[in-house]
A protein has these predicted regions:
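Alpha-helical DNA-contacting segments of helix-turn-helix folds
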Residues: 20, 55-62, 70, 107, ...
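Generic hydrophobic, amphipathic alpha-helix propensity
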Residues: 8-17, 33, 58-66, 70
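Amphipathic alpha-helical segments used for helix-helix packing
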Residues: 98-115, 163-170
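Hydrophobic alpha-helical connector segments
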Residues: 57, 71-99, 141-142, 150-154
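Amphipathic alpha-helical packing segments from all-alpha helical-bundle domains
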Residues: 71, 108, 115-141, 148-152
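N-terminal intrinsically disordered/low-complexity leader segments
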Residues: 1-7
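Hydrophobic alpha-helical segments that form the core
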Residues: 132, 144-167
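Helix-turn-helix
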Residues: 11, 15, 22-53
Length: 170
């Protein structure tokens, strides 16, 4: 067991991400995370007051990764049309949700009150902003209201597809 750790907080978050993805957030505990990080059972409490604090960090990392993946999909090829990049973003979103199903479920779980975690809310918003940018590019001059409606509609479609395919309903 390690008693001195370079960046304990990041190591704990990394361990929590691994456990979440392997077993789901319901099977995570601060004790299991400490064991995965090879630190004392009390070490996580130095950085996280509650399990929810740590879950919020795991969720934030998931949204950051999703935003990065969506950005890459929308910028992957300058020769692609906006519509083609939009379609690639949809595929990337579904792939992320299916390949990282446990993290994805946590990201969209009501177990974490995003309002209580501004950095998590910011990461989630940044990922959604990737969709806003491409929809706005596809629809020059679109009103804010219509842009919002289209974004929610398209997000609901890919989100629903992840849930249906992930739950083997289709």
């Amino acid at each position: 067991m390690k008693y001195h750790h370079g960046n304990l907080k990041e190591e704990l978050i990394s361990s929590a991400c691994k456990i979440c993805e392997a077993n789901g957030h319901a099977h995570m505990s601060l004790r299991s995370i400490a064991k995965e990080a090879n630190v004392s059972q009390t070490a996580p409490y130095r950085h996280f007051k509650t399990k929810e604090d740590l879950l919020a960090e795991v969720s934030k990392k998931g949204f950051e990764k999703l935003g990065e993946i969506l950005n890459q999909a929308s910028c992957q090829n300058d020769n692609m049309t906006a519509k083609e990049r939009f379609i690639e973003m949809g595929f990337a979103y579904v792939k992320f949700g299916l390949e990282r199903r446990n993290t994805y479920d946590l990201m969209h779980s009501p177990i974490i009150d995003k309002v209580e975690f501004p950095e998590l809310l910011e990461a989630a918003s940044a990922a959604f902003d990737e969709l806003i940018k491409i929809i706005a590019e596809l629809n020059p001059g679109i009103s804010d209201t219509d842009l919002s409606r289209q974004c929610i509609r398209h997000w609901a479609q890919v989100h629903g597809l992840v849930d249906l395919v992930g739950d083997a309903k289709i």
